[in-house]
Amino acid sequence: MYIENINGPEDVKKLSDDQLNVLAEEIRKALLEKLSKHGGHFGPNFGMVEATIAMHYVFESPKDKIVYDVSHQSYPHKMLTGRKDAFLYEEHYDDVSGYSNPEESEHDHFTIGHTSTSISLALGLAKARDLKEENGNVIAVIGDGSLSGGEALEGLDYAAELGGNLIIVVNDNDMSIAENHGGLYDNLKELRDTNGEAECNLFKAMGLDYIYVKEGNKVADLIEAFKRVKDTKKAVVVHINTQKGKGYKLAEEHKEEWHYCAPFDVETGNPLDSFDGEDFSSVTAQYLLKKMKEDKKVVAITSATPTVMGFTEDKRKEAGKQFIDVGIAEETAMAMAAGIAAGGGKPVYGVYSTFVQRTYDQITQDLCIDSNAATIVTFWGSVYGMNDVTHLGLQDIPMMSNIPNLVYLAPTTKEEYLAMLDWSIDQDQYPVAIKLPGGEMISDSKKITKDFSQLNKYEVTEKGSKVAVIGLGTFYNMGCEVAKEVEEKTGTKATVINPYYITGIDEILLEDLKKDHDVVITLEDGFLEGGFGEKIARFYGDSDVKVLNYGVKKELLDRYDVTELLEKNHLTVQQIVGDLKF
């Protein structure tokens, strides 16, 4: 196999056209083998094989710098830059991350996982090159809907003004994670339909040079195009028309489902571990569709991740105009939600915890200053969520709980969540966010009668003395286990509290605990610093009550093991009980 002899881009350059085509098939075969066992981003990488080969054939990486947007489509790049073993041999599968990583290779220039950043990052590299009076090409590779992100458009807007070498490869596969949304994609289609000759051209309108490659999965055509723009003295867009998922029929035919995959059977495409039960995503879609039928003012909003809310293609069609996908544009999603709320609508914006930080300003300015009553549902904000350093869901508690006027809620069960969601949608006084628990969804069938408009009212679920355990959201059940262990080991029945609210404290309840409690334990699923527990500790600061805060130490974790992380942060029942001194 040719791939076995590729130790760097210099080896790619030695191959003939026919050999490069064989190399492309070998890369796909290796990707299929690994992803079927390991999981990962499927469609984006299968569509970028030829373009990656062509770039490394023409350009001189790492002197010529290639920046992949999101970098979820960088697997072929890794295979051609000295990391092939991580794709050829199962025992080495975990040697590399799923994104670009400078610690792995000099051919990776940034740790990237969020979208729409590549052009701006490339602009910076190009400017640094020019300041140092050096030579070299800087290439930004962007696709999978990333052009709909505001930062990408900002970068395009400035690129022509830069005045030096910058090559922007637009990987146009007519898809985001799901279908693309936004007017600019109509222009991309027009360019595809006219072989790049359409009079209306977004890129030319921004002052950029432009060439179109119709066959974006043909190595020879791509090599020719990249040779044309190599060493250009200005910014140029190379628009390549590729097929997402190319080489695996199921991925070609079902692009949304095969954007990312869990381990699967190659013959059938069926996942090796199937899950047919309810989760917070499916429950959210089911509830909202029912609510939409009852109230035409209810609208669900996503920023290119519809299935996180459970809105698969059939459910999006069922919702019709009451479902909005703004593309990869969290800022617009949040500001639009604020506008809908201000206009009398009832918006619900579902978003991964890791992407909330992309719209922090809109939450503060557009939502909370005027108290526009929109609902934000944050998914996967947990140690049990995504564990890549670029996608951690551990920051939303300190980030969101300190925004004035925002009510941030933490349910522990399906029933609590739906009660909170129902209240939030129908009330018109507060912007509300709901942090969904991590791990498997718990359903206890309890009827929830709590009035959530009585803000910051905690609930004592078990009354005891001496020790009080406040378990927030995901970690409420751990709090119950801590209380049980305390009673078994010491005979002391501990108080257990479900706080519900992240953004405020129940001063009356906390004051009452002073009467017969010596220790208050707080448990939270996220970073400790600036978080929930510190609010409790601050309340007891001048009293004799000792407060023990448990959560995750603030650090940039990458591909952590959950069990090890919990133990490292003293977040096991045995460790917590062991910290108590009677």
Where are the regions a protein language model picked out?
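N-terminal amphipathic, basic-rich helices that act as targeting or association modules
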Residues: 1-79, 204, 215-219
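Cofactor-pocket helix-loop regions in the catalytic cores of large enzyme subunits
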Residues: 19, 24, 28-31, 42-47, ...
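Glycine/charged-rich beta-loop-alpha catalytic/anionic-binding loops adjacent to active sites
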Residues: 29-36, 95-111, 133-139, 312-327, ...
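Cofactor-binding active-site loop characterized by glycine-rich and histidine/acidic residues
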Residues: 41-162, 298, 303, 312-313, ...
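Non-catalytic terminal/interface segments that mediate subunit docking, oligomerization
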Residues: 65, 248-357, 362-372, 465, ...
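Glycine-rich ThDP/TPP pyrophosphate-binding loop and its adjacent helix/strand module
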Residues: 73, 108-264, 268-277, 282-286, ...
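A glycine-rich helix N-cap at a beta->alpha junction
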Residues: 86-96, 161-175, 368-380
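Peripheral docking tails and interdomain loops at the edges
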Residues: 269-274, 385-387, 407, 527, ...
